[in-house]
Regions:
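Acidic, proline/glycine-rich low-complexity IDRs
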Residues: 2-82, 87-90, 98-103, 108-241
Length: 241
């Protein structure tokens, strides 16, 4: 049901709030396709974007942008979506049964509508606590480049963070009624995978590890719960502060 998964330990995590500026223009054909893909899926333009400054990026890594989409009646939650992670072509990875993981990823995080998210460049009184969630999203997006690794759905990343969340698990974004969101085609046969980054607590990660082989299924079911026929029956896929 799930790919062969792995637990990943990341380099020490740093909050990147000071490395934020605003960027809207896309700089490549691939990035423009991603931008258009997000707009099509969400039915609107992002309300603002955040970009990692080059001085906080690993050497030779291209900048990563977060597009911020507001809650709507149809999708009543915040959507934070990356553009730029897929510029890195990940190494090949065998995921079993003769299959290989895709080699270009982008990432998205869904945040509760109760969280106050405003553009810090436009509003000097805007809260900044939500930027810690965006930093977790960026750290996930940086991981494959930093480690020269391939990450895919069901992987968990332990970032060694002190606080509410210690890392993240990669999920399929089942909150959407259509699976189209998970693939952005850049040509007829090539696509970018888009996975949901779900923050996890140290308690959840510890329980997952104790369950060993069945741990990843248990962990993923905490956010998207299925019946015996694997039909989605409930979901709690939103990050909170």
């Amino acid at each position: 049901m799930y790919n062969d998964h792995k637990l990943i330990s990341s380099r020490p995590f740093a909050t990147l709030q000071s490395g934020v500026n605003i960027e809207v223009k896309m700089k490549s054909k691939r990035q423009q396709k991603l931008y258009d893909h997000y707009k099509t899926v969400f039915g609107e333009e992002p309300i603002f974007s955040l970009k990692l400054k080059k001085n906080v990026l690993p050497t030779d890594m291209k900048p990563i942008t977060t597009l911020v989409f507001k809650p709507t009646d149809e999708m009543p939650f915040w959507k934070l979506c990356t553009i730029g992670a897929s510029d890195y072509l990940m190494p090949e990875r065998d995921i079993g049964f003769g299959r290989k993981a895709n080699r270009r990823n982008e990432y998205m995080m869904f945040i509760s509508p109760d969280v106050d998210i405003r553009n810090p460049s436009d509003d000097e009184d805007a809260p900044t606590d939500w930027l810690s969630l965006n930093s977790l999203l960026w750290a996930t997006a940086e991981y494959a480049f930093n480690e020269k690794d391939n990450i895919t759905v069901s992987d968990t990343i332990d970032m060694g963070i002190d606080g509410k969340y210690c890392g993240a698990v990669l999920l399929l974004p089942e909150v959407f009624k259509t699976p189209k969101i998970v693939k952005c085609y850049v040509s007829e046969h090539k696509y970018i995978s888009i996975f949901q980054v779900m923050p996890i607590t140290r308690e959840l990660l510890t329980k997952k590890l104790r369950k060993k082989v069945g741990g990843i299924y248990w962990l993923m079911e905490q956010f998207y719960t299925h019946d015996d026929d694997y039909k989605l029956i409930s979901s709690k896929p939103f990050a909170t502060l």
